[in-house]
Amino acid sequence: MNHAFSFMLAAALLAPATTLAQDTTTSAQVKRGEYLVTTGLCHDCHTPLIQGPDGPAPDMKRALSGHPQEIVVKAPAIVPEPWTGAMSPTLTTWSGPWGVSFTANLTPDPETGVLRDFTEQQFIQTMRTGRHQGQGRRILPPMPWPWIGKMTDDDLKAVFAYLRQIPAVKNKVPDPIPPK
């Protein structure tokens, strides 16, 4: 058997094993991301609540799609002293001294998903700096980016990998409303 044939045979036999190892790593990374998103309570704000027979429940058909585009908010809520903020019944709109913030659509929808143009590194920078794509406008309350930003690079990469593969939900979240 000549060396060229031996090399090609070895490469052909090893390629599926390499691909399998990569798929396993990716699958493990996505599972880790799902675990972190779930236990990190991302659904609490990024998945709208709907009223059911037992009270509010997450609308999993809209999982992680942010503030529903059909619910229009035009101005910050006015709250009496000593309160400083208010939230919508869907838990996707928050109003306070910063104005009104709407939870982002974290799904990979190519038109409306906030992460559609992010690289993995930009996602990590966003979580570490509190700025969109690591350099844009600041992320508004109640997003707990200072704590999420303390996650390891591997954990943030896992979260990003998970968010990139969840079902896309077309939902255009409005821009924040500045304070009056």
Question: In which residue ranges do the predicted regions lie?
Answer:
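The canonical Cys-X-X-Cys-His
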Residues: G33, T39-L49, V159, L163
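Electrostatic cytochrome c docking/interface patches
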Residues: T19-T38, I50-P56, E111-T112
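N-terminal, post-signal-peptide region of Sec/Tat-exported proteins
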Residues: H43-V72
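Bacterial N-terminal signal peptides
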Residues: S6-P16
